[in-house]
């Protein structure tokens, strides 16, 4: 096994031979015949297609996307959202009922449940305008994209981080991570910017102004590892236990 992902009530694993194994609740990704799609069309089962040739899996809310070595995307699970009928993808990401296929030419294709994501031509146009998108992440009701020029594009619920990014997110960003309520971005100068509901880092702005080398998150908090070995955590402003700095 080279990768394993949770599906709420099930799990999906990718093996080194390119096969996929699932177990758990049948409707949340375990049964690969449930809401199964191949080449943009509904199929009875993906069992044979998942025996080999898979190079990446991505999953959210009981939905699974599997990227094959031929560039096609297979999908199955709880929501049953139809992926594009093309075979020129090199990466795939699933987040909050929305799906993003990264194509070989650098463009991004989106699909998912209407009203809960970027499944529209206007948002897809924004993602494909300007610099190439390197990464997309999702909070509970918002999304953020990191672009090749170090800028960040965000959309969705403003209280969950979907508001327009501030000027300090227009360049220099090298990583973004989500939690359920917002996002945090690591900049090339070692500083951190966070935004969205419950992700206010003003209380520790001095600790996060430099020296951060890695960001992590759980469902409601963020953690920053600093170059001196210390850790700074923050999150929902009502959760005072998450406002700490731990020395090395």
Residue ranges and their predicted role:
Residues 25, 57, 62, 67, ...:
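A generic structural signal for ordered secondary structure
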Residues 1-5, 14, 232-234, 247-248:
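Low-complexity/repetitive intrinsically disordered segments
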Residues 2-3, 16-19, 52-56, 69-72, ...:
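Tandem repeat domain/solenoid detector
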Residues 9, 16, 25, 62, ...:
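Short loop/turn segments immediately following the C-termini of beta-strands
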Residues 10-13, 22, 63-66, 75, ...:
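Conserved core positions of repeat-based scaffolds
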Residues 23-50, 76-86, 109-128, 155-169, ...:
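Short glycine/serine- and acidic-residue-enriched loop/turn motifs that recur at repeat junctions
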Residues 3, 12-13, 47-48, 55, ...:
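Short, exposed beta-strand/loop patches in secreted or surface proteins that constitute
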């Amino acid at each position: 096994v080279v990768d394993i992902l949770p599906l709420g009530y099930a799990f999906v694993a990718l093996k080194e031979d390119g096969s996929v194994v699932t177990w758990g609740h049948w409707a949340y990704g375990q049964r690969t015949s449930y809401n199964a799609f191949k080449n943009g069309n509904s199929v009875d089962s993906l069992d044979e297609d998942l025996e080999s040739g898979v190079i990446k899996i991505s999953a959210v809310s009981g939905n699974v996307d599997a990227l094959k070595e031929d560039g096609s995307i297979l999908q199955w699970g709880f929501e049953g959202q139809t992926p594009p009928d093309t075979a020129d993808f090199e990466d795939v990401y699933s987040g909050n009922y929305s799906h993003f296929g990264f194509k070989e030419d650098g463009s991004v294709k989106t699909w998912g449940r209407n009203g809960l994501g970027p499944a529209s031509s206007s948002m897809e146009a924004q993602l494909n305008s300007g610099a190439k998108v390197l990464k997309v992440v999702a909070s509970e009701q918002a999304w953020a994209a990191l672009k090749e020029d170090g800028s960040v594009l965000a959309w969705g619920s403003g209280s969950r981080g979907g508001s327009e990014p501030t000027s300090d997110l227009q360049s220099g960003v090298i990583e973004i991570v989500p939690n359920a309520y917002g996002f945090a971005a690591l900049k090339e100068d070692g500083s951190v910017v966070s935004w969205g509901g419950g992700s206010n880092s003003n209380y520790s702005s001095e600790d996060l102004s430099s020296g951060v080398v890695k960001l992590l998150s759980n469902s409601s908090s963020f953690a920053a590892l600093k170059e001196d070995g210390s850790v700074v955590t923050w999150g929902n402003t009502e959760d005072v236990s998450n406002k700490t700095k731990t020395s090395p």
